[in-house]
């Protein structure tokens, strides 16, 4: 990504990444559609009642893996291949540690987590079985996300998509087999999702071993190195925490919504599935912008960093406007993919949420790109703070207004968080670019003086 038209390169990189994100969300959407249509609205509520804690835990895993890929992209752009390989190995060790710790903790604390979320009694058992299986599958989630992050860091976003596509097809059949044939209910949906995730991760590993000589580790690369661990943690942990901090606000939001009853839990679950699916293009272009800027930082090309930010925001805002219009006018129709026509109250509430969200969807085009570029330039702490502002905004709306305005307050919690975070991260991103530009100019001046 250090040569050629920035917009063209970013779109080429983002497209397979987008398809991969869509397929990853398809896992969840297929689960929800089959559960909602076959098992009913309460079963759908069971699957969705813990979505915020899944976002917190799995978001931390995915964010950490994405962060671990940033130094890899930087050293790949700087053509320091041996150092890049050192970081790949040390990142893998950190991922293994995270997988063991999170799987053990989350599985043991699952009942307490559901109590904190105020899960209604009539859906508790199904929610518990679904969430526990998802937690037990954390190692597979980390396996796929770390390997796909490494492949993307060296410019290959196509391969992870291909393997994810294959596993997505399998996920459909596993869903139907586990739920319809084996009668495993909500637990069957979780088993199908985790199995598909495991297959995509294993396929990525086989591809790297057989085809990606660039990523093969030599004996000297397979040692734990303090400087590598330190830099990886400095990038990965803040990025993971960024997702988790945002998720804490979502947990407060979901807990407040759960108290409104199973009808609104079903409506919220339905709206969240649609939201997560339509957010995939934002995530794809933001990740593309981050990798683009990180590689060009390593290559010392500050002008291309600025162009990368402009291109990313332009594409993101443009998509946000189009998607927002769709949510405003087609929310009710989209909700019917998950809930039958007879669940009128659920459909109306879901459509209301999507309609309110649609008016502010454009802001995500700025927020996600600016945050990921800030992270890609190495200022992960500042990117994390944008997540803190989101958490605070959601918490204030839910704790301060749900008691008075009910579900209407829930409908405006996300938008308040997005606007608040954007007001912080966009000027911060511009500051980070200016600082990076000065740093690169200083390095170039020292090199010229030395020569």
Regions found by a protein language model. Give the residues of each.
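Short runs within selected transmembrane alpha-helices of multi-pass transporters and secretion channels
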Residues: 65, 134-152, 160-168, 189-202, ...
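Helix-terminus/linker motif at the lipid-water interface of multi-pass membrane proteins
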Residues: 26-45, 114-121, 177-186, 244-273, ...
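Transmembrane helical elements of multi-pass membrane transporters/channels
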Residues: 12-31, 133, 167, 196-200, ...
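N-terminal transmembrane alpha-helices
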Residues: 2-39, 52-67, 71, 96-103, ...
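Short alpha-helical transmembrane segments in multi-pass integral membrane proteins
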Residues: 1-14, 72-137, 181-237, 293-360, ...
């Amino acid at each position: 990504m250090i040569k050629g038209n920035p917009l063209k390169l970013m779109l080429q990189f983002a497209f397979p990444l987008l398809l991969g994100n869509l397929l990853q969300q398809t896992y969840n959407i297929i689960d929800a559609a089959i559960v909602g249509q076959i098992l009913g609205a309460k079963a759908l509520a069971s699957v969705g009642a813990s979505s915020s804690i899944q976002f917190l835990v799995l978001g931390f895993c995915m964010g950490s893996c994405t962060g671990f890929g940033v130094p890899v992209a930087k050293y790949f752009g700087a053509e320091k291949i041996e150092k890049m390989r050192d970081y790949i190995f040390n990142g893998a060790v950190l991922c293994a540690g995270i997988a063991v710790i999170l799987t053990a903790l989350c599985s043991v604390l699952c009942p307490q987590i559901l109590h904190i979320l105020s899960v209604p009694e009539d859906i508790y058992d199904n929610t518990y079985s679904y969430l526990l299986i998802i937690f037990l599958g954390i190692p597979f989630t980390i396996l796929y996300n770390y390997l796909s992050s490494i492949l993307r860091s060296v410019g290959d976003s196509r391969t992870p998509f291909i393997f994810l596509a294959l596993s997505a097809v399998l996920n459909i059949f596993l869903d139907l087999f586990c739920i319809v044939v084996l009668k495993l209910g909500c637990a069957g949906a979780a088993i199908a999702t985790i199995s598909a995730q495991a297959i995509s991760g294993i396929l990525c590993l086989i591809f790297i071993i057989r085809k990606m000589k660039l990523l093969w580790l030599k004996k000297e690369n397979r040692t734990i190195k303090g400087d590598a661990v330190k830099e990886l943690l400095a990038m990965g942990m803040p990025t993971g925490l960024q997702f988790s901090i945002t998720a804490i606000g979502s947990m407060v939001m979901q807990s407040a919504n759960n108290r409104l009853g199973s009808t609104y839990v079903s409506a919220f679950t339905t709206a969240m599935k649609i939201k997560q699916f339509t957010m995939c293009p934002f995530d794809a272009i933001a990740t593309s912008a981050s990798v683009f800027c990180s590689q060009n930082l390593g290559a010392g090309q500050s002008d291309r960093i600025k162009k990368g930010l402009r291109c990313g925001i332009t594409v993101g805002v443009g998509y946000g406007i189009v998607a927002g219009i769709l949510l405003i006018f087609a929310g009710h129709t989209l909700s019917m993919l998950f809930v039958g026509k007879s669940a009128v109250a659920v459909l109306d509430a879901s459509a209301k949420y999507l309609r309110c969200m649609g008016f502010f969807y454009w802001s995500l085009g700025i927020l996600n790109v600016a945050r990921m570029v800030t992270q890609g330039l190495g200022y992960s702490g500042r990117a994390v703070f944008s997540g803190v502002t989101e958490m605070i905004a959601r918490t204030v709306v839910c704790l301060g207004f749900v008691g008075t305005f009910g579900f209407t307050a829930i409908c405006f919690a996300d938008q308040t968080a997005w606007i608040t975070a954007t007001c912080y991260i966009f000027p911060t991103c511009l500051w980070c670019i200016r600082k990076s530009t000065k740093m690169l100019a200083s390095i170039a001046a020292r090199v010229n003086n030395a020569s």
